[in-house]
Regions:
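Charge-rich, low-complexity N-terminal segments
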Residues: 1-78
Length: 78
């Protein structure tokens, strides 16, 4: 499994905005739980699904007004 951490700008204090909530919903539509946080969010995904899920996250974020998306993907061996 891979861990994906992401932030989406612009930051809107007190309300994450559609550019964030729609992107989170796009990930959740794949049956993936998102740990939503004020300074970044994360989820776990398998390697096969990674490009599809990331693609949907980016597409929906920018369709809804994102100006910048930062994504970090990590593999943690147990």
């Amino acid at each position: 499994m891979l861990t994906v951490e992401f932030t989406i700008e612009p930051f809107v204090e007190g309300d994450p905005g559609a550019h964030v909530t729609a992107a989170v919903a796009a990930v959740e539509a794949h049956g993936i739980a998102v740990d939503f946080g004020p300074f970044g969010s994360l989820f776990s995904v398998n390697e096969k699904s990674l490009p599809i899920v990331i693609g949907d996250l980016l597409r929906v974020a920018y369709e809804n007004g994102a100006t910048f998306v930062n994504i970090a993907v990590s593999r943690f061996n147990s």
